[in-house]
């Protein structure tokens, strides 16, 4: 999860997936996605020990751009060698959001759904695919 205001930003994470954010210096992945003890094992907010596993990141800067995603698109969204944001994945989304008219914004949920269920994406993952995007508007 993420909370951001003019006074700062708080990012919270438990489990896999991730939150990519631009705090004014380019996209970054402040928290490394968690992995369980075994492959395909993760931690959930409903686990008894969730509070002790919760990872947090704080900044005194507001978030200009945010993308939160589930593990199903993690390999598309991140450079897995160094857990950095894969810019060719995020740039079209953020550029589209920044320049979209209201009519185009109304179409984005359906277009995002089509993209996430497309053959090109499904060839690379068979896991759940969720992507939430946000921009700070002046």
What are these regions (language model features)?
Residues 1-20, 55-60, 123:
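Catalytic core of PPM/PP2C metal-dependent serine/threonine phosphatase domains
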Residues 6-8, 17-19, 25-27, 35-36, ...:
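Short acidic/polar capping segments at secondary-structure boundaries
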């Amino acid at each position: 999860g993420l909370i951001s205001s003019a006074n700062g930003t708080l990012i919270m994470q438990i489990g896999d997936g991730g939150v990519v954010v631009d705090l004014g210096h380019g996209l970054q992945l402040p928290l490394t996605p968690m992995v369980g003890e075994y492959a395909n094992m993760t931690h959930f907010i409903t686990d008894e020990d969730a509070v002790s596993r919760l990872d947090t990141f704080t900044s005194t800067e507001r978030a200009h751009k945010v993308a939160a995603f589930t593990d199903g698109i993690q390999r598309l969204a991140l450079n897995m060698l160094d857990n950095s944001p894969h810019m060719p994945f995020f740039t079209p989304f953020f550029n589209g959001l920044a320049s979209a008219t209201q009519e185009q914004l109304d179409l984005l949920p359906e277009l995002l759904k089509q993209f996430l269920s497309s053959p090109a994406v499904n060839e690379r993952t068979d896991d759940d695919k969720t992507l939430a995007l946000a921009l700070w508007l002046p």
